[in-house]
Amino acid sequence: MIRLFVGLGNPGPEYEATRHNAGFWWTDALARRWNCQLQPDRSYHGLMARCTQRGTPVWLLQPMTYMNLSGKSVAALARFFKIEPAEILVVHDELDLLPGQMKLKQGGSAAGHNGLKDIQAQLGNPEFWRLRLGIGHPGVKAEVAAYVLRKPPSAEREAIEACIDRSLDAVDRMLGADMPAAMMQMHAKPPRPKPPRPVTAPGAPVPPTEPSA
């Protein structure tokens, strides 16, 4: 069962809408769905909400330490409430997935993500869960640092938001400790939108919906 949901990002209005803050967008969306309010908590170096789901307390956390020091916040809360690494989900932006794509996995390397590196170091254990939200790649490694700190175009932001909505539909499975089912649900391809119906000009004959006899 996931007891701690962590969204990664950078604090401050100048970063709020940037790609690197996709994890914050996710925890904000979950807080709205659960009608919980994230509040500053100095003890955990971030914004925290305690919510009750299935009769059990669970926590939402947004570290306010800047991305590279996220582990300080996560480890402080996890140790105080005796939350094991396998009961933690960390949501973060992912360059190697396109906007609208996501991947859920447990453990593994930080793959160059500084927030994950610090969490892994502070917990002393890599076996926490990660939800990777695709933001796309600029195509040139030298441009990555600037790319993640820019706002995505509206179409990309909409794709990321739609991906977040789909992932939230699987949270109940995480609360029920059914991570394989949550993974299958998140990794399923989203349904294709139906093509728009043809627009008929005024006065034009309406095409038949069925072949005439």
Curated annotation (Swiss-Prot):
Catalytic activity: an N-acyl-L-alpha-aminoacyl-tRNA + H2O = an N-acyl-L-amino acid + a tRNA + H(+)
An annotated Gene Ontology molecular function: peptidyl-tRNA hydrolase activity
Location(s), subcellular: Cytoplasm
Ranges of Pro residues composition bias in the record: 196-213
GO cellular component, one term: cytoplasm
Binding site for tRNA: Y15, Y66, N68, N114
Record-listed E.C. numbers: 3.1.1.29
Catalytic residues (positions): H20
Official protein name in the record: Peptidyl-tRNA hydrolase
Species annotation: Leptothrix cholodnii (strain ATCC 51168 / LMG 8142 / SP-6)
Gene name for this UniProt entry: pth
